[in-house]
Amino acid sequence: MGDKDDVRIGVFVCHCGVNIKASVDVEEVVEYAKKLPGVVYATDYPFFCADPGQEIIQEAIKEHDLDRVVVAACTPKIHENTFRNCVKEAGLSPYYMEMVNIREHCSFVHMQEPEKATEKAKDLIRAAVERAKRLEDVPTKEVEVENSVLIIGGGIAGIQAALDLADQGFKVYLVEKEPTIGGNMARLAKTFPTDDCAMUILAPKMVQVGNHPNIEMITYAEVKDVDGYIGNFEVTIEKKPRYVDEDACTGCGVCAEVCPIEVPNEFDLGIGTRKAIYVPFPQAMPLVYTIDMEHCIQCGLCEEACPQDPPAIDFDQEPEEIRLKVGTIIVATGYEEFDASKLEEYGYGKYDNVITTLELERMINPAGPTEGHVIRPSDGKEPHRIVFIHCVGSRCPGKEEKGEAYCSRICCMFILKNAQLIKQHEPDAEVYCCYMDVRAFGKGYEEYYERAQKQFGVRFIRGRPAEIVEDPETKNLIVRVEDTLTGEPMEIEADLVVLGCGLVAPEETYSKLADILGIDRSPDGFFKELHPKLEPVSTKVRGVQIAGVAQGPKDIPDTVAQAKGAASEASIPMSQGKVEIELITATVDEDVCGGCGACAQVCPFDAIEMVEKDGKRVAEVQDVACQGCGQCAAACPSGAMQLRYYRDEQLMPQIEALLAEALEEEEEE
């Protein structure tokens, strides 16, 4: 760090068009900045992020011999790298630039209070100047990148990302917790708005994955631990025992034919049954049987029937631990339906003939448990009058007990597709859709919505049903709803009610992976992107990308597009072969360190080790593993642990300057 009394600071206040200037008096702020100790130059400009604005900064650095720069503009998330590169081109260290967010923190939050916005901008700039005086250069380190990638999740997002990366020559490890890849898309009959057969477009990609020389599928497995950093992630995977030799099994199915045990089929959401030895669906990849040991009675019939010599059945299989080293990671985990039983007024789980859209999907699917026939679970008869209810568990802000606040994006179209498929199968059926709003946002979606109304005669009622009551004799369902367009209360007697359930993040899976990978989750439970517009597939952990529903609910086209984006992002460091890591990391004053180990205990990245040096136990930081979170510095009782670029001697003067006027007023009182 330079001598804080000798630095020459330039302050540059951006208008951001009118975003800042409309609320902040930028000219007044500039005049204020000129009087701050250490500031030798200050000016404003409409767009400092544009080329002319950056030229102004670079010329000022040279003309006024500036060695520190403060840019008061918008969020650093968008333009910090822009201004770092700008000052670097002018000959300064990029770390000698301090950025102040006076758009989100001043202008936007005080849009109707220009005086407050202006005074707050002054306070923030005053504090930034004090920090700028003490900024230090940050060393960097170049590390080799492993030429392989881990993809977590074998749905359509994981499949597409795997194929894109494998085709570029990278080694891909595709980990899926189920016995087969395919995800929820494999459950679907058709896809909207083109009504393509879902398996017809998914299965070829599954086969490509299975046959690709650069892809290693690790199914029936879960990621248990991840250590390391971009370019060098060390991954531990636990592969569950199938009790069937994957190399020996040919998928002939003779074992399932002789198995005497039948249990509800989770792939069919409990509608159909499967044997204790099974494949989830005929097109499974890999086509290898799995023994459900929870229900298996170990009668040995499957082993006797197996035509392989020796039999592929292996009751002695144990969990296998697999260790990998990869350069990048893509998280492509999926979703589960909202638990509709939480809404007692709809009777899901209580009334036999109330089902969800995904359960209906398995009925409509010709390869499903009912071979494409929609039936009432109560009596097996085909329903004549069906009521769909939109937004079950979605769009419930402030009513957490009723569901999630967000829109799940696909539910409306999911219902429209199934409503049309029912009408195609049974033209005389009466189909009602109770909706709040129909959100047909994608390409061809509005036309698909119109087709449901005009061509198929699906009836739409604008209103969320208040309750569903079952007739105990007929098992029919009375749906009570008010049409908010006409104000008319209605009672519809339905043979079958289908709940359009929202998409939610499986809590156990997402919470575990967030902890293992060190990535954040959004308030909706899905994984949080680095920036919703500019970095939609990146996370706060460099080298870890997200794709598909892992980032939030979306349809298949958006999922595939995002998977391709994540694959592209993951390929960059692997193509380059090396990455430069800025070492904004923890540092240890070994003379002060007492060797207590508190820092190592709180480090979420296992970047700190306790070692012996000169007969003394001290902390040692692995720079490339440290993510600069600062938890160790906060936990250190002696002050020996500091975070480079965010040291106490840099932050405390900034805080004192920020509070200076408030403290002066307090003293006067």
Swiss-Prot record:
Keywords annotated in UniProt: 4Fe-4S, FAD, Flavoprotein, Iron, Iron-sulfur, Metal-binding, Methanogenesis, Oxidoreductase, Repeat, Selenocysteine
Named cofactor requirement(s): [4Fe-4S] cluster; FAD
Residues involved in [4Fe-4S] cluster 4 binding: C603, C626, C629, C632
PANTHER family for this protein: COB--COM HETERODISULFIDE REDUCTASE IRON-SULFUR SUBUNIT A, FERREDOXIN:COB-COM HETERODISULFIDE REDUCTASE SUBUNIT A
Species in which this protein is naturally found: Methanopyrus kandleri (strain AV19 / DSM 6324 / JCM 9639 / NBRC 100938)
EC numbers: 1.8.98.-
Known pathway: Cofactor metabolism; coenzyme M-coenzyme B heterodisulfide reduction; coenzyme B and coenzyme M from coenzyme M-coenzyme B heterodisulfide: step 1/1
A biological process term (GO) from this entry: methanogenesis
Chain's role: Part of a complex that catalyzes the reversible reduction of CoM-S-S-CoB to the thiol-coenzymes H-S-CoM (coenzyme M) and H-S-CoB (coenzyme B).
Domain called 4Fe-4S ferredoxin-type: residue spans: 239-270, 287-318, 584-613, 617-646
SUPFAM superfamilies given in the database record: 4Fe-4S ferredoxins, FAD/NAD(P)-binding domain
Cofactor binding annotation: Binds 4 [4Fe-4S] clusters per subunit.
Residues annotated to bind [4Fe-4S] cluster 2: C259, C296, C299, C302
GO molecular function: 4 iron, 4 sulfur cluster binding; metal ion binding; oxidoreductase activity
Binding site for FAD: 153-176
Binding-site list for [4Fe-4S] cluster 1: C249, C252, C255, C306
Domain of life per record: Archaea
Designated name of the protein: CoB--CoM heterodisulfide reductase iron-sulfur subunit A 1
Record keyword Metal-binding present: yes
UniProt-annotated binding residues for [4Fe-4S] cluster 3: C593, C596, C599, C636
Oligomeric form and interacting partners: The ferredoxin:CoB-CoM heterodisulfide reductase is composed of three subunits; HdrA, HdrB and HdrC.
Membrane-spanning intervals of the chain: none
